C-alpha cells in the first residue's frame, strides 16, 4: 500500500516521523502517532487512532515502525480520496436531494439493488447511523457510518490474515460490531 505514495510524500512523512523518533530506532510510540499525523495535516479521532493502532501494532509492544506508519498514511490518504465516492453514494440514496436519507429513500434504493427490507430492518439501519436521533441520515452521519464500516472491515481482514489471535483494544471500537453499525447501511 505504501507503494501508492510519491517519493515526495514519503520524504515528508519520514521527516515528520523522525521528529518524534527520539532515539532514532525507526519507531514511535502509539501515543505519539496522533501527534505525528496531526503534524501532517490529518486529524484522527481517538477511536480512529485506536483502530489504526490495532491494525499495525501486531506485537502489541506500543511501537509503530516507519514502514507501518507509511501504510497507515497511504490508507488515510486513500480514504480521503474516496470522499467523492461517498458524496456520490449519498446522492444516490438522497433521492429528493434534501440532504437527508429517509426510511422511504433507503427502502427504495435497497429494493433497487435486490434487498427487500422489512420496516423493522429499515428502522434498525436508520437508527444505527442516525447520531442526532432525527429519524434520518444526514451526510455527516452517512460518512461516519461508512468510514467506521471500512475501518472495521480492515481490522477484521487483518485479524483473519493474522489468524485471529488478537482481541480488540478497549474503547469505542471494542463494542460488538452488531452494536456499532454492523448493519451500517448501506453498501
Curated annotation (Swiss-Prot):
This is Calmodulin-like protein 1. SMART domains: EFh (SM00054). Its main location: membrane. Residues 169-178 have a biased composition (Low complexity). The modification Cysteine methyl ester is found at residue 184. Ca(2+) 1 binds at residues 21, 23, 25, 27, 32. Ca(2+) 2 binds at residues 57, 59, 61, 63, 68. Calcium-binding protein that binds and activates CAMK1, a calcium/calmodulin-dependent kinase. It comes from Oryza sativa subsp. indica. Ca(2+) 4 binds at residues 130, 132, 134, 136, 141. PROSITE patterns: EF_HAND_1 (PS00018), EF_HAND_2 (PS50222). Disulfide bonds: none annotated. Residues 153-187 are annotated as: Disordered. The modification N-acetylalanine is found at residue 2. Residues 8-43, 44-79, 81-116, 117-152 form the EF-hand domain. A lipid is attached at residue 184 (S-farnesyl cysteine). It holds the Pfam family EF-hand_7. Residues 154-165 have a biased composition (Basic and acidic residues). Changing residue 80 to T: No effect on CAMK1 activation. It is a lipid-anchor. Ca(2+) 3 binds at residues 94, 96, 98, 105. Keywords: Acetylation, Calcium, Lipoprotein, Membrane, Metal-binding, Methylation, Prenylation, Repeat. Belongs to the calmodulin family. Residues 185-187 form a propeptide. Changing residue 71 to N: No effect on CAMK1 activation.
